[in-house]
Design a protein with these regions (language model features):
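Conserved non-cysteine loop/helix-boundary elements of the Radical SAM core domain that shape
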Residues: 1-40, 47-71, 97-108, 167-169
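A cross-domain feature marking catalytic cores of carbohydrate-active enzymes
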Residues: 4-6, 42-48, 81-86, 134
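A structural motif corresponding to the C-terminal end of an alpha-helix
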Residues: 30-42, 119-129
Length: 183
């Protein structure tokens, strides 16, 4: 399959601010649809806490759901999982650039993350798996996410670049720790 990293927030106004060099949301959606049309499964991601509105989050989820519904109807394949996590503001470029700017509230804490997981599970009903993001939230919050609609704790990571580039410090968990989290 094709990993769905790079989606961040599929809303033009937010994406232009947080990652202007990554291109428009329609490009990410087009690439995912092309992969699905070729028979590849894909995953979808969502980073929250950039100062986006609830409406922006719903628009992101709706774009993913629309593509999922279309791909399932046309190709009988689509996204197999959805993974959301909060931006790690303390140590990444976006957080440093916007620290103290007061133009919007940055970040998303555990409660907001868990609420987003629950809403994602309800909204993305045709995506089989919602993954708990232990690499960004830690195993304790990931365990709570499993009670909020997530059904996948992910896996141990041998070599990981996307989440670690976001500045998180929680990317280490052993197989035993993950088993303990889900049992």
């Amino acid at each position: 399959g094709l990993p769905g990293g790079g989606a961040e927030m599929l809303v033009d106004s937010v994406r232009n601010d947080i990652s202007p060099k990554k291109g428009e949301p329609k490009n990410w959606l087009r690439i995912m649809e092309e992969a699905q049309s070729l028979g590849l499964t894909t995953s979808a991601t969502n980073v929250i806490g950039f100062g986006e509105t609830i409406r922006d989050r719903v628009e992101h989820l709706n774009r993913i759901r629309d593509l999922q519904d279309s791909s399932l109807a046309q190709y009988n394949i689509g996204f197999t999982s959805f993974i959301a996590w909060p931006v790690q503001l303390e140590t990444n470029t976006f957080g440093k650039r916007n620290r103290g700017s007061n133009k919007f509230t940055l970040g998303a804490g555990p409660t907001e993350y868990l609420r987003h997981v629950a809403i994602s599970r309800l909204f993305l009903d045709s995506i089989e798996h919602i993954q708990a993001s232990w690499p960004t939230m830690g195993v304790e919050i990931a365990q709570m996410a499993l009670l909020c609609g997530a059904d996948d704790a992910g896996s141990t990571m041998m070599e990981e670049n996307v989440v670690s580039a976001s500045g998180t410090s929680k990317i280490s968990a052993s197989e035993f720790e993950l088993q303990k989290t889900i049992i």
